[in-house]
């Protein structure tokens, strides 16, 4: 059984303040820290061979906190792919106790452009609820200077196909800690959702989603798998 575990990061400080975050690098709130730890409890008995996160700290914090109680007791280490010599481990014994963690901006949250840092309610008052709904929930309409969900998928899906999927085909169990929209674009592809269906897909913070790769397709498991 080869597993793909997807996890939206725990609540960030700006989630808590109801602000558009996007690529602004904001850490987890206290609640988000607890959500990440709780998420780790729910997956602690699932095998994990590789971890992938975005380059944003809330994604990295969530992955590291989630792994603190993993039953394998293995330690995640960040692989600096631009300088592989920096993170090379020269002890086979220690290598066996580690899990590589790779970061990529391809997994970053959707970039919200001129909305970043603004309060969602205030933006709705300024531009109208219908316009903001189009920016947030339509598939191809982007906010000013930002990305649509379609645009986000244009970077997440190639990275998944080129970097992550080959590892699943090798039987590696993968844990991805990322963001609401980058994960929605992946799930759209995994579950073959239409442009209309993906608009109603909501991902709560700190709740893992587990798929099994059968060699032919991805099958979604019940939350109690862990």
Swiss-Prot record:
<feature type="site" description="Transition state stabilizer">
    <location>
        <position position="179"/>
    </location>
</feature>
<dbReference type="GO" id="GO:0004619">
    <property type="term" value="F:phosphoglycerate mutase activity"/>
</dbReference>
<comment type="similarity">
    <text>Belongs to the phosphoglycerate mutase family. BPG-dependent PGAM subfamily.</text>
</comment>
<feature type="active site" description="Proton donor/acceptor">
    <location>
        <position position="109"/>
    </location>
</feature>
<comment type="pathway">
    <text>Carbohydrate degradation; glycolysis; pyruvate from D-glyceraldehyde 3-phosphate: step 3/5.</text>
</comment>
<feature type="binding site">
    <location>
        <begin position="8"/>
        <end position="15"/>
    </location>
    <ligand>
        <name>substrate</name>
    </ligand>
</feature>
<dbReference type="InterPro" id="IPR005952">
    <property type="entry name" value="Phosphogly_mut1"/>
</dbReference>
<dbReference type="InterPro" id="IPR029033">
    <property type="entry name" value="His_PPase_superfam"/>
</dbReference>
<keyword id="KW-0324">Glycolysis</keyword>
<comment type="function">
    <text>Catalyzes the interconversion of 2-phosphoglycerate and 3-phosphoglycerate.</text>
</comment>
<feature type="active site" description="Tele-phosphohistidine intermediate">
    <location>
        <position position="9"/>
    </location>
</feature>
<feature type="binding site">
    <location>
        <position position="120"/>
    </location>
    <ligand>
        <name>substrate</name>
    </ligand>
</feature>
<keyword id="KW-0413">Isomerase</keyword>
<feature type="binding site">
    <location>
        <position position="58"/>
    </location>
    <ligand>
        <name>substrate</name>
    </ligand>
</feature>
<feature type="binding site">
    <location>
        <begin position="136"/>
        <end position="137"/>
    </location>
    <ligand>
        <name>substrate</name>
    </ligand>
</feature>
<keyword id="KW-0312">Gluconeogenesis</keyword>
<dbReference type="InterPro" id="IPR013078">
    <property type="entry name" value="His_Pase_superF_clade-1"/>
</dbReference>
<dbReference type="Pfam" id="PF00300">
    <property type="entry name" value="His_Phos_1"/>
</dbReference>
<feature type="binding site">
    <location>
        <begin position="180"/>
        <end position="181"/>
    </location>
    <ligand>
        <name>substrate</name>
    </ligand>
</feature>
<dbReference type="GO" id="GO:0006094">
    <property type="term" value="P:gluconeogenesis"/>
</dbReference>
<feature type="binding site">
    <location>
        <begin position="21"/>
        <end position="22"/>
    </location>
    <ligand>
        <name>substrate</name>
    </ligand>
</feature>
<dbReference type="GO" id="GO:0006096">
    <property type="term" value="P:glycolytic process"/>
</dbReference>
<protein>
    <recommendedName>
        <fullName>2,3-bisphosphoglycerate-dependent phosphoglycerate mutase</fullName>
        <ecNumber>5.4.2.11</ecNumber>
    </recommendedName>
</protein>
<feature type="binding site">
    <location>
        <begin position="109"/>
        <end position="112"/>
    </location>
    <ligand>
        <name>substrate</name>
    </ligand>
</feature>
<dbReference type="InterPro" id="IPR001345">
    <property type="entry name" value="PG/BPGM_mutase_AS"/>
</dbReference>
């Amino acid at each position: 059984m080869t597993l793909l575990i997807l996890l939206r990061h725990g609540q960030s400080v700006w989630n808590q303040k109801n602000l558009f975050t996007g690529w602004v690098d904001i850490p987890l709130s206290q609640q988000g820290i607890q959500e990440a730890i709780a998420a780790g409890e729910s997956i602690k008995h699932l095998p994990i061979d590789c971890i992938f996160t975005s380059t944003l700290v809330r994604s990295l914090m969530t992955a590291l906190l989630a792994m603190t109680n993993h039953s394998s007791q293995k330690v995640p280490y960040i692989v600096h792919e631009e300088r592989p010599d920096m993170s090379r481990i020269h002890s086979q014994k220690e290598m066996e106790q580690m899990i590589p963690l790779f970061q990529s901006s391809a997994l970053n949250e959707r970039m919200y452009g001129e909305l970043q840092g603004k309060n969602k309610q205030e933006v709705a008052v300024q531009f109208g609820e219908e316009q903001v709904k189009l920016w947030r929930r339509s598939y191809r309409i982007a906010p000013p200077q930002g990305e649509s969900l379609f645009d986000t998928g244009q970077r997440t899906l190639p990275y998944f196909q080129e970097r992550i999927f080959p590892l699943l085909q090798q039987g590696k169990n993968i844990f991805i800690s990322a963001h609401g929209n980058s994960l929605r674009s992946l799930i759209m592809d995994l579950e073959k959702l239409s442009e209309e269906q993906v608009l109603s897909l909501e991902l709560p913070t700190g709740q893992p989603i587990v798929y099994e790769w059968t060699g032919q397709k991805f099958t979604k498991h019940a939350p109690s798998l862990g």
